[in-house]
Amino acid sequence: MLSFCDKKFPDRDVVVTGFGAVTGFGLSSNELWQALCSNQQAVRPLTPDQIDHWDALAQYLKQVPSAAVVDQELVLQSLHEKLSRDSIGQSVVADFGFDLVNSMTLLALLEALQTAGLTLEEARQFNMGCVVGTSKPSLRAIEDWFAMTSGRQSGLEVGRLGHENTFGSALLPDACQRACCRLLNATGPGQCPVAACATGLIAVLQGAMLIHQGVVDVCVVGSADASARASVMAAFHRLGVLSRAENPGSGCRPFDVNRDGFHVGEGAGILILESAGHASRRGHHADVRVAGGAWLTDPTGLTQIDATGAVVESVLDQLEDGRLTDLCSVHGTGTIPNDQCEANGLKRHFGASLPPSFGIKGATGHLLGAAGSVELVVAIQAMQKGVVLPTTNYLDADPQCFMNIESQLRVRPEIRSVSKLSLGFGGHVVGCRLHRES
């Protein structure tokens, strides 16, 4: 287990002081929370101006393409408003903001700073690191680059491939991490984990390690992803993991007996981690601690997974710290193998005493590289507010998935701890344990 709490050195305990999120529900974590509490769905049928190659994709899928997308124009408008008086911020948006992954990351970061009670000027004075990842570079930039170099497209407009910073600010996967460092003048270690759908949670663990080891006092962590592209959706359809439901809002059904896959979602989640001592010295009361984490590999295959849940069980075993988890935020993709594996792992670890669990992909879509960080933001809110969220579209329990899941919101003020699970293609299996102080 990766432990981030030490009785001998309590000042090095890792606390969460702020968070922000951008999703198909809106440009803030509060909009996301309100939508989840009211059982809304962000997945919608897409119009031709929302996704490339709409006609060909619709023909291939044999239905109208659907996803939970984020409006780049609204994101940029919000960034320009929030950074109108900050010259550094304006230059960062000019250099990086033309790509949706970067712009969502920056907007989520600004919200995270606000909830942490920090201004940009204050944050720029800290000994700060930055661990922000994504599952892939900008697909739009890659596809446009390929189209141009293969002679199929020319005269691409400035702001996409024609932008002078396209190579460094879109084609390289660490662009979103570098954008955060530029905005914050962060000179501590910078990392960009790329671990498929476990990217966000791995970023949190890596940042927590930097703080607990005394390398930095503050670390920006999280991830972003914008994969509502024809190439991704066609590939997932061929893999058999994209939902074929006629009603896209009810397509993704985690742990439901009628589940048949997920819909793609876009988004970003950013958290501010600090050492407990640093947060205390600046007068900030932090009630959420990152107690520990676990990070293992399932070597079964690129997209295959061990259905017994043995690796998931091992991750949960390592997260155990003598106290039962009050709540689990599961990965819950709504695919047959993932949900079976998770359910088996939870049952092997907890036995008949399964804690309440929930998953949000039926509402948000699968955010892929952004899933772990956005879902951790939601898990923190659930723990702070004492709420077990409904698992959207969970109607008929799969008898092969022994789970403690509800389709309606439940109030549980006694929640003091939450465990978050993330799984990713390639065998990434990650867990994180959070505690709330009384």
Question: Where are these predicted regions, by residue range?
Answer:
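Acyl-CoA/ACP chain-elongation machinery
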Residues: 215-260, 293-306, 330-339, 354-403
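ACP-dependent fatty acid/polyketide chain-elongation machinery
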Residues: 1-94, 277-289, 377-392, 430-438
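Active-site-proximal alpha-helical scaffold in enzymes
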Residues: 105-119, 173-177, 184, 190-224, ...
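Phosphate/pyrophosphate-binding loops at sites that engage ATP/ADP/AMP, CoA/4′-phosphopantetheine
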Residues: 58, 79-87, 110-128, 279-286, ...
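Condensing-enzyme catalytic core mediating Claisen C-C bond formation in acyl metabolism
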Residues: 9, 13-17, 40-45, 247-327
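Active-site nucleophile and cofactor-binding loops and adjacent substrate-binding regions
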Residues: 97-102, 123-125, 160-173, 191-199, ...
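Glycine-/small-residue-rich "gating" segment that lines the acyl/pantetheine channel
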Residues: 45, 152-164, 205, 209, ...
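Active-site-proximal gating segment of KS-fold condensing enzymes and close homologs
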Residues: 131-191, 233, 238-240, 338-352
